[in-house]
Amino acid sequence: PNLDCYKELYRRKIPVIFYNNFYKNLRCPRVIINDRDCARQLLARLIDAGHKNIAGIFFYDNYASVEKFQGMAEAMQERGLEMKDHYIKWCISDEARQHSYVRSIEKFLKGLPKCTAIVCCNYIVYRHVRNALARMGKQIPADYSLVCFDYSADTYRQEGVTCSVEQGFEMGRQVALRLMQMIENRDCDDKDYTAVLKPILYDGNSIRNR
């Protein structure tokens, strides 16, 4: 969405920098997390614990989420595990903001009787998955192991979820620094203004050894 607006801003040489998400076909810089590396680290924890039938829930209208999925696929392939299409649930961002999405996740998981672990692409999906599992009478990690990207609340320690922690403050700081440099240099192209941050992972107790 709004791709035409961004192209017009670029045509007018107005500096634009993307935060967290971005468009591949624009020459604007961005500040992002290395989501593929993050996926490899999260999946390694599940695979090392003996999980093979791993489900994932991702947004197809969000490039960062697609990167997370690709990282998951690569991690499973590298470890000799099959990525099963029906173990992946795709949705649009707006859909995941609806309370009814919990029922959709519940139906998805009930269709995967061999699934033992779930990868959540962000905190919103994580909350929906927890609610769906509660409706199903399932426990974490006794029935399902769980990992989450971009946990955006400060409760990950209390929740005990293995996750990557959202770096909102640092990302905002990096965006501001780079945007000021672009304004000072009168640049609108990505000339080394992009920053790719290393993921920060928290190891909780949401993964069960099999």
Predicted regions and their residues:
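Short beta->alpha junction loops
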Residues: 87-98
